[in-house]
Amino acid sequence: MKLGLPYKGSKNTIAEEIVSKLPPGHKILDACCGGGAVLMALALSLKYDSVVGNDLNPATIALLDAVLINKGQIEYEHPPVCTRDDFFNSLQRIENGDFDIQDCVNKFCASFGNDGKTYLYGAQIEEYKLAAEQMLTAETLEQRRKFYRKFYSLINADNSEDKERLQKLEFMQRLQSLERLERLERLERLERLERLERLERLERLDIFDIDYKEFDVVYFDIPYKGTNKYDFEFDYDRFYSLFKSLKTDLNINAFLSEYDAPFTCVAEFEKTQLMAAAVGSSKTTSREKLYYNGSADEYRALMGRNFDEKSEQLSLF
């Protein structure tokens, strides 16, 4: 199953591979846990007695908490509809710091491409999609019948003679997938997961303010350098100093996901991401690397019998 929240840049396709390249330990920190894919893989792996997640994004931490720790906060059977206005009102409340769990659900489940910024449905199909959602999830049979009739009338009204058959077919294909409900189903499946008792807590701290002394392994997934995908400036030089000092000053083994970094590369992963489009979708593939704040020999010793001599990591030394 897919791990983590519906999240742009999610590592759900490679999370378990990443965890397999990390050494076992007592307590591990996922310092930039984002949508929680690696965090959940860590908890499920049973390689650690305790797992802690951290991220600066308040909506992310609130939703992870609702799905993984303090469960029962999200309505799955009859989820509230999320119109375009609802979506942007939720974003505003999150920005103001005065939000509830439904605002977090709206942000992550009703955004296009999981970007948390753009409303999921285009203006051309929004009315159809919302009617289709509600004919499946409205609380009463009477309400579901009402939205079924609305959906049916919308489809029939759109069946005018000036529309070509191919255009109509493409339009109907776009209506088949109710992405928001699919993402809610994903959250519900995650909430039902067991074996997450090793997930100790979630925090919301700047990575430069964390007291790392309680951890013997730390994993970072910082903004990738040169990608220009973020609305804030990240101090890479300061981070590199922190990453290095965890080993030299505290003897903490730290790992970093990046495309390129000035540290020991211990593994590579091929990540495929599905990119949403107006009709259909496309795939992009990238090579992500895992870096270590020690030497190659130290990494081999850390992994012990778990070091995979046959894996691609061997050629990186």
What are the functions of these language-model segments?
Residues 45, 49-201, 316:
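Class I S-adenosyl-L-methionine-dependent methyltransferase module
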Residues 29, 54, 220:
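Active-site flanking residues adjacent to catalytic metal/cofactor-binding acidic residues
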Residues 119-121, 126-130, 226-238:
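Mobile active-site "lid"/loop adjacent to the S-adenosyl-L-methionine
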Residues 203-236:
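Active-site segment flanking the S-adenosylmethionine/decSAM binding pocket
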Residues 12, 35-38, 57-60, 69, ...:
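Short, solvent-exposed loop/turn segments at secondary-structure junctions
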Residues 1-32, 37-44:
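S-adenosyl-L-methionine
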Residues 225, 231-317:
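Long, positively charged, glycine-interspersed low-complexity recognition regions
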Residues 26, 51, 217, 253:
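Hydrophobic "anchor" residues on beta-strands that sit immediately upstream
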